[in-house]
């Protein structure tokens, strides 16, 4: 009898981790929980990565951090927040207990799909099978939690006009993540993008990610479900107009998807008073904006923390925390109900390309990475990569090889300005190197395979 009771309790405990919690949905430009409009009152929640190793993932939702999650969830809930944003996780770890801790405090998790190793590089952008596989792993791990509120397919990938072409890869990542969720028959989880507040490309970026490109390239389901802006324009006791909030709201007033501040909280004036909260949740902004996420929970070297976490784990609330709590407690934004809401707005036209400020076409997006296609492409090649060269070595050899014979690189080459992407641009760097080496060798003879030992002939 005792054994049965223990077993029953274990089953109840396990099922509690996945107890029903109303997921968020989108209609038009608003988030909803059940029939009631949902305004984001969020906090960025991510400890710093190792200062000496930026590829290290410190996963705040992993089971090893369960005690921290439980305490932090209560502190964040007491603040008045209903969302945390997490920038990187290790999908191979267990997250049940931490997700339950936040669910128990009615807190949703908005999660970046990328990590320091798999994010889209703004200067040398790719969207390949390794990256897509990593995104899929995060989706697989977190789709089962009903308090997984949304996924970000990228964060500040574009930060000036010169790297605007990288946004094509973001749109491809959005498309493939959404289609993967659909193909696996998971519940619909919104996939969007968090952008830097960069004046020179701000309007083009928003239009490009949300425009209906089907009529241009027949690429369906690639529109971003929402847009976030990392915006620090309001500092101290600013106001709606001086801060730039009025101008940003006007720029986005006709968009048809939810838009929110994916980061806010300027610290040029300290302690932070968060008077912008009154504007964000006021009638001036709520027709366009769905709230915002304050940067950030724990105090780090950049001095944005709401909570000081000591070396012994003690949590000490800062003046910033108390100021934000008072501001959030004082707001009462108008609520829209889903059943009676008739969305308005206009889906933007895809922005026209130009060589100076927006060198990216919407006529085509990068191909969907496909492991089978890539594996088959490198089978039985006469010349292929020798082992696993480093990323820098691959870039060096491909740069030289493609310079001497661009035809050998046609199937692995991309041109976002022209909207052209080779069939194997979604393959890994090593696979692309093998494909190019083999094509070059076919035209220039077996002696051209080596490239200093990077390539090798196969018997």
UniProtKB/Swiss-Prot annotation:
- GO terms for molecular function, please? 1,3-beta-glucanosyltransferase activity
Which cysteines share a disulfide bond? 69-98, 211-350, 235-266, 374-427, 383-449, 402-409
From the Swiss-Prot or TrEMBL record, state where the protein is found: Endoplasmic reticulum lumen; Secreted
Q: Which Pfam families match?
A: Glyco_hydro_72, X8
Residues the entry annotates as binding (1,3-beta-D-glucosyl)n 2: 156, 197, 202
| List of glycosylated residues | 34, 68, 90, 104, 146, 160, 212, 218, 254, 284, 308, 334, 344, 354, 370, 423
Which residues of this protein are catalytic? Answer: 156 (proton donor), 263 (nucleophile)
Q: Which residues form the signal peptide?
A: 1-19
Q: Which UniProt keywords apply?
A: Cell wall biogenesis/degradation, Disulfide bond, Endoplasmic reticulum, Glycoprotein, Secreted, Signal, Transferase
Q: Which GO terms describe its cellular component?
A: cell periphery; cell septum edging; cell tip; endoplasmic reticulum lumen; external side of plasma membrane; extracellular region; fungal-type cell wall; primary cell septum
Mind telling me which InterPro entries this protein's record contains? Glucanosyltransferase, Glycoside_hydrolase_SF, X8
State the EC number(s): 2.4.1.-
GO biological process: any one?
fungal-type cell wall (1->3)-beta-D-glucan biosynthetic process
Annotated (1,3-beta-D-glucosyl)n 1 binding sites:
87, 155, 295
First-level EC class: transferase
Cited function: Splits internally a 1,3-beta-glucan molecule and transfers the newly generated reducing end (the donor) to the non-reducing end of another 1,3-beta-glucan molecule (the acceptor) forming a 1,3-beta linkage, resulting in the elongation of 1,3-beta-glucan chains in the cell wall.
The similarity annotation says:
Belongs to the glycosyl hydrolase 72 family.
The name of this protein is 1,3-beta-glucanosyltransferase gas2
Q: Which gene encodes it?
A: gas2
